[in-house]
Curated annotation (Swiss-Prot):
Site (Important for activity): H88
UniProt GO molecular function: glutamyl-tRNA reductase activity; NADP binding
PANTHER family, alphabetized: GLUTAMYL-TRNA REDUCTASE (PTHR43013:SF1)
Gene designation: hemA
Enzyme class per UniProt: oxidoreductase
Gene3D superfamilies for this protein: Glutamyl-tRNA reductase, N-terminal domain, NAD(P)-binding Rossmann-like Domain
Annotated catalytic residues: C48 (nucleophile)
UniProt superkingdom: Archaea
The UniProt record lists the keyword Secreted: no
Annotated residues for binding of NADP(+): G177, A178, G179, A180, V181, G182
Reaction(s) catalysed (UniProt annotation): (S)-4-amino-5-oxopentanoate + tRNA(Glu) + NADP(+) = L-glutamyl-tRNA(Glu) + NADPH + H(+)
Name the record gives this protein: Glutamyl-tRNA reductase
Keyword set includes Cell membrane: no
Notes concerning its domains: Possesses an unusual extended V-shaped dimeric structure with each monomer consisting of three distinct domains arranged along a curved 'spinal' alpha-helix. The N-terminal catalytic domain specifically recognizes the glutamate moiety of the substrate. The second domain is the NADPH-binding domain, and the third C-terminal domain is responsible for dimerization.
Length: 393
């Protein structure tokens, strides 16, 4: 039984379309996961350079419907299935599919999306295991190779870009957003000795937390405070998730000279009377560092393949564990019902004891089989036992 076969991914990246188009698709996928994830597990990764929807156990027609939702905005959509879908997610988490090879920001974004969607109940079951393993791959790659040495991500590249246009040590800077990208921006600006730093976030406590680490000043992310920063600062970096423009005008007499848009989707309106730096402007800077990191790519790819080879065994073990938990729950409920019918607590206790005595050795045997690589046999036995007690897997 191939437990990777039910995995599908619908993928769109910066290579195929503009950041503006990615933003529109990202909005559609937010609505899509809210509608569909109750029926089957889903995981959506939306960053400034990609929108990817992962589904587990969805019928082919459902996967195609998700792909069609992408095609309302763009034609260049890829559908990947099985082990290839897992490999793609592992490479994304490792930074191997990024504008800047080995960037660390994307790993934080993978984790943020995962945590949020697990809490919402969207990412669960074996899909949860796949994404957890992708995070592990990303951490291993950055620990065991030098692929992330230097700029950490698009935020770092944007700071390098801006530093060629003005002296950051004499500048006032604001960072809108305190997530993975925003907090990274703030930390790097502080390390470069920026003249004055402001951190704005919708959750003010998060802004205060980042400000405390960077010596910056926390402000709430409101329209009034954004305009205040535009009036006071030389450069403003936007890294927020927003379905509307966060910056759509520049106040008269504002000090701002440069606005950097790393938002998801684009959060800075076109046509502003200042220099706006967008992701497309950072590709040339990225190419320089990608050449330096090329020697580490093979090492990172080897880690991806090693973890991918181990994934089927891990999924089999998790599948057995989940099936066994459901099996025991069903059996214990049946024992309680029998005891209740007998009208005797002692009878219920005896029934539960019998269930444990009969099933636990089989449970341990199935787990051991999965751990020893007898994956198909373990899964088959789990299914047989589950069907025997009347629960379909």
């Amino acid at each position: 039984m191939d437990l990777l076969a039910p995995l599908s991914a619908v993928v769109l990246t910066y290579r195929e379309v503009s950041a503006e188009a990615l933003g529109k698709v990202g909005q559609e996928m937010k609505r899509c996961i809210e509608r569909r994830a109750r029926a089957f597990p889903m995981y959506v990764l939306h960053t400034c350079s990609r929108v990817e929807a992962y589904l587990y156990g969805a019928p082919p027609e459902e996967v195609q419907e998700v792909a069609e939702a992408y095609r309302r905005y763009v034609d260049s959509v890829r559908v990947i299935t099985g082990a290839e879908a897992a490999r793609h997610l592992f490479r994304v988490a490792a930074g191997l599919d990024s504008i800047l090879i080995g960037e660390t920001d994307v790993l934080g974004q993978v984790e943020e999306a995962f945590d949020r969607q697990v809490r919402a109940g969207y990412t669960r079951g074996l899909l949860k295991t796949v994404v957890e393993r992708a995070v592990r791959v990303g951490k291993r790659v950055r620990t065991e190779t030098a692929i992330s040495r230097g700029p950490r991500g698009l935020g770092s590249l944007s700071i390098i870009y801006v530093s060629r246009l003005l002296d950051l040590r004499q500048a006032k800077a604001a960072v809108l957003g305190a997530g993975a990208v925003g907090s990274g921006l703030a930390m790097e600006l502080a390390s470069r000795g920026v003249g004055k730093l402001y951190i704005l976030n919708r959750t003010f406590e998060k802004a205060r937390e980042v400000a405390a680490k960077t010596g910056g000043e926390a402000r709430p992310l409101t329209r009034e405070e954004v305009e205040r920063c535009l009036r006071e600062c030389d450069v403003v970096f936007s890294s927020v998730h927003s379905m509307e423009y966060v910056i759509d005008r520049v106040p008269e007499g504002a000090s701002v000279k440069i606005v950097v848009d790393l938002g998801v989707p684009q959060t800075v309106a076109p046509g502003l009377p200042v220099k706006v730096v967008r992701i497309e402007d950072l590709r040339q800077v990225a190419e320089q560092y990608n050449a330096e990191r090329a020697a580490e790519v093979a090492k990172a790819e080897a880690i991806v393949e090693e973890e991918l080879a181990a994934l089927p065994r891990l999924l089999a073990r998790r599948y057995v564990e989940e099936t066994v938990a459901a099996l025991l729950e069903t059996a214990m409920t049946a024992a309680e019902e029998e005891g209740a019918r007998a009208g005797c607590d002692a009878a219920a206790l005896a029934a539960k004891t019998t269930v444990k005595r009969v099933l636990l050795p089989l449970v341990e045997k199935m787990k051991k089989m999965a751990e020893d690589g007898q994956m198909e046999e373990a899964v088959r036995l789990a299914n047989v036992l589950t069907q025997a007690v009347g629960r379909k897997t």
